[in-house]
């Protein structure tokens, strides 16, 4: 990752780290880089989630885009995957989403999509960063008819909603509880599920600029669990702030995470011969129970580093059409180029409707192993070399021998902090505690910062 761009665009505390000045420059330089090869006036879609800082950053970003002659289509509040969809289908030069996803309201972010609807490649981000760090701005400054124009485009939301509905099936007789996280899905999820003829109950649908992801949404599903039980809903669906991820709740109030959602949809596609290469792409953090369920079903898996960016890269390079993360980012490439919480929710409900099975029945095929993750502060120079320390390598090997194939250990460095992450999965909580704590003690002794 670069100096400004992380794995999911540029992020920071709004008006402190991610300032209007930086947003203007990102619009100006990003717009220039992404439209250099256009033969006609470049067209860029811009959307945001419901954060109080969204309109401030949107105004600055759009000013930057207009300053290099871009025709800007202002979408207002819209889910991140909606931007990706519109860029592709309306043949835009690029798209920009202003959101910090599942982060709290004080944060915000800016991420770009190329004309293919995918997030930017590293070389494009580095080109933008080079312009940001240049001693002076030498880009063209058009005037009069050379300046960009701004078009309000509320039709974009309607087009995205119609697209979502076309991917589903009639949900008559099904009751769906929705948690739209006081975020981007609050403008669309209700309408989409009503159009699919579901009975609905909704929470997290009253954004005020400050309550996005606050006790609601995919990272806080507790209220949704209660709503499902209170209403007798067939399933609950929780989105995050920009609606690119989904966590579900079954009819008993139990959480159904990204691993189980991928398995349910993947098995359905596999049985219909529609799962490309009969493979699901997942990350190293997916639960061992998920892997065992895939093996039992005869479905292959491709494993990547943590981050939906890497999942998408593997899907594109190898021609896979389903992938995602335990956290609820699920990419269904037949329909869209990025994680799409509402799309995934519709596909999950479709599987339930077409199989006649409850969500708890479908999810029961994946036995989730207890998992524990411990972060250990270590010397930054050692976090990538931990396995070179004999005592650490030996204790990991010893624990894996004791597991005898009925558990999993993952030790990996943090990408952004001086931390070593120690994770284990095993059949019982007691076993997980034993494996993680034993390894963590050795790591602290050998390379921990407190020594």
UniProtKB/Swiss-Prot annotation:
Protein name, entry field: Phosphoglucosamine mutase
Transmembrane segments: none
Catalytic activity entry: alpha-D-glucosamine 1-phosphate = D-glucosamine 6-phosphate
Cofactor comment: Binds 1 Mg(2+) ion per subunit.
Entry's Gene Ontology cellular component terms: cytosol
An individual GO BP term: peptidoglycan biosynthetic process
Function: Catalyzes the conversion of glucosamine-6-phosphate to glucosamine-1-phosphate.
Annotated CDD domains: GlmM
Gene of this entry: glmM
Cofactors named for this entry: Mg(2+)
Gene3D superfamilies per UniProt: Alpha-D-Glucose-1,6-Bisphosphate, subunit A, domain 3 (3.40.120.10), Alpha-D-phosphohexomutase, C-terminal domain (3.30.310.50)
A Pfam cross-reference name: PGM_PMM_III
Active site: 101
PTM comment, free text: Activated by phosphorylation.
Domain of life: Bacteria
Signal sequence, renumbered to the chain: none
UniProt binding sites for Mg(2+): 101, 240, 242, 244
Lineage: Bacteria, Bacillati, Bacillota, Bacilli, Lactobacillales
EC code(s) of this entry: 5.4.2.10
């Amino acid at each position: 990752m670069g100096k400004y761009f992380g794995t999911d665009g540029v992020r920071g505390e709004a008006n402190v780290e991610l300032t209007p000045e930086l947003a203007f420059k990102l619009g100006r330089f990003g717009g220039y880089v992404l439209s250099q090869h256009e033969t006609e006036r470049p067209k860029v879609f811009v959307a945001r989630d419901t954060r109080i800082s969204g309109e401030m950053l949107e105004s600055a970003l759009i000013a930057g885009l207009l300053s290099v002659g871009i025709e800007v289509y202002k979408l207002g509040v819209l889910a991140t995957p909606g931007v990706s969809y519109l860029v592709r289908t309306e043949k835009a030069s690029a798209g920009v989403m202003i959101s910090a996803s599942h982060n709290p309201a004080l944060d915000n972010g800016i991420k770009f999509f190329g004309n293919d609807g995918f997030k930017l490649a590293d070389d494009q981000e580095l080109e933008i960063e080079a312009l940001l760090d240049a001693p002076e701005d030498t880009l063209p400054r058009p005037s009069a008819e050379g300046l960009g124009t701004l078009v309000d485009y509320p039709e974009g939301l309607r087009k995205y909603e119609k697209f979502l509905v076309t991917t589903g099936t009639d949900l008559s007789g099904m009751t769906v509880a929705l948690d739209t996280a006081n975020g981007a899905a609050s403008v669309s999820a209700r309408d989409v599920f009503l159009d699919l003829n579901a009975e609905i109950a909704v929470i997290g649908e009253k954004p005020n600029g400050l309550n996005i992801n606050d006790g609601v949404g995919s990272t806080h599903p507790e209220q949704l669990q209660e709503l499902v039980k209170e209403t007798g809903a067939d399933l609950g669906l929780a989105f995050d702030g920009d609606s690119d991820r989904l966590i579900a709740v079954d009819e008993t109030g139990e959480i159904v995470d990204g691993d189980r959602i991928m398995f349910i949809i993947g098995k359905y596609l596999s049985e219909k011969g529609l799962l490309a290469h009969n493979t699901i792409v997942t990350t190293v953090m997916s639960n061992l129970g998920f892997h065992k369920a895939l093996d039992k079903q005869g479905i292959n898996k491709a494993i990547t580093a943590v981050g939906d960016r890497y999942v998408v890269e593997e899907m594109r390079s190898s021609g896979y059409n389903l992938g995602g993360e335990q956290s609820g980012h699920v990419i269904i490439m037949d329909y869209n180029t990025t994680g799409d919480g509402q799309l995934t929710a519709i596909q999950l409900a479709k599987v339930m409707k077409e199989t006649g099975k409850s969500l708890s029945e479908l999810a029961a095929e994946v036995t989730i192993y207890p998992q524990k993750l411990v972060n250990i502060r270590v010397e930054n120079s050692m976090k990538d070399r931990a396995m070179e320390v004999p005592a650490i390598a030996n204790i990991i090997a010893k624990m894996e021998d004791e597991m005898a194939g009925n558990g999993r250990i993952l030790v990996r460095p943090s990408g952004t902090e001086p931390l070593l992450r120690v994770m284990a999965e095993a059949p019982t909580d007691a076993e997980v505690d034993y494996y993680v704590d034993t390894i963590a003690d050795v790591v602290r002794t050998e390379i921990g910062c407190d020594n």
